């Protein structure tokens, strides 16, 4: 089994300065045009998610109280931290 240490993962700051991403893995590896990616993000402020056309996202709240996801034309959803966290899937 392989373990990931967040303290050793490289950090990519978001262009809007509202958060940062720590990439765990992608397929194919080290490609910008990936088929899938697993990452951990830290969100510091309200802001827009970057667009990845055609890519489905699955969001699971790992810590914190709650997070509100809003889209003007698609959905509104509040993620709440639970003992067994729920996920939100969106494009």
Swiss-Prot record:
Cysteine-cysteine disulfides: none
Classification via Pfam families: HutD
Listed InterPro entries: RmlC-like_jellyroll, RmlC_Cupin_sf, Uncharacterised_HutD/Ves
PANTHER family linked: PROTEIN VES (PTHR37943:SF1)
Protein family: Belongs to the Ves family.
Protein name: Putative protein Ves
Organism: Shigella dysenteriae serotype 1 (strain Sd197)
